[in-house]
């Protein structure tokens, strides 16, 4: 059974693939099969993925307010996907903020450049503080 961390890795893969080819969602089942995401974890993955897409404009507007000199679209695909996932979980789910930030940092360490973990922490921490 896949862990929640592996589920989040899959969501990042789905968001990345969506950005590269938003006209076609055939990649969804392929990515989930490849990563062995099944049953309850598949439902969790798809809920996160579709929740992000359904709220993408709101998420991006919120994130843009915490990106000093950049827009979310100026970031790399992976960094953008990690921030969108983190923001979605903070804004629309009951996942504890400490877990969201830790997962974003771990995903950034695995998938992004060396400066990304600190950047993810700063942006998502600012979002948490503004939300209170």
From Swiss-Prot:
- The question of whether Aminoacyl-tRNA synthetase is a record keyword is answered with no
Family membership noted in the UniProt record: Belongs to the NusB family.
Q: Which UniProt keywords apply?
A: RNA-binding, Transcription, Transcription antitermination, Transcription regulation
Its protein name is Transcription antitermination protein NusB
Q: Which HAMAP family match?
A: NusB (MF_00073)
What is this protein for, i.e. what is its function? Involved in transcription antitermination. Required for transcription of ribosomal RNA (rRNA) genes. Binds specifically to the boxA antiterminator sequence of the ribosomal RNA (rrn) operons.
Listed Pfam families: NusB
Lineage of the native species?
Answer: Bacteria, Pseudomonadati, Campylobacterota, Epsilonproteobacteria, Campylobacterales
Instruction: Tell me the GO BP annotations in alphabetical order.
Output: DNA-templated transcription termination; transcription antitermination
Q: Which organism is it from?
A: Campylobacter jejuni subsp. doylei (strain ATCC BAA-1458 / RM4099 / 269.97)
Tell me the domain of life: Bacteria
Which Gene Ontology MF annotations are present?
Answer: RNA binding
| Transmembrane annotation, as ranges | none
Instruction: Quote the cellular component terms of the Gene Ontology held in the record.
Output: cytosol
């Amino acid at each position: 059974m896949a862990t929640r961390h592996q589920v989040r890795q899959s969501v990042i893969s789905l968001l990345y693939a969506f950005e590269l080819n938003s006209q076609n969602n055939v990649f969804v089942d392929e990515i989930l099969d490849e990563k062995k995401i099944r049953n309850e974890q598949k439902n969790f993955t798809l809920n996160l993925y579709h929740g992000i897409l359904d709220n993408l404009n709101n998420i991006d507007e919120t994130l843009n307010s915490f990106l000093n000199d950049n827009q979310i679209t100026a970031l790399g695909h992976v960094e953008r996907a990690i921030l969108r996932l983190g923001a979605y979980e903070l804004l629309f789910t009951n996942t504890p903020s400490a877990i969201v930030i830790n997962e974003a940092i771990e995903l950034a360490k695995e998938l992004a450049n060396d400066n990304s973990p600190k950047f993810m922490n700063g942006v998502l921490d600012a979002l948490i503080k503004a939300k209170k």
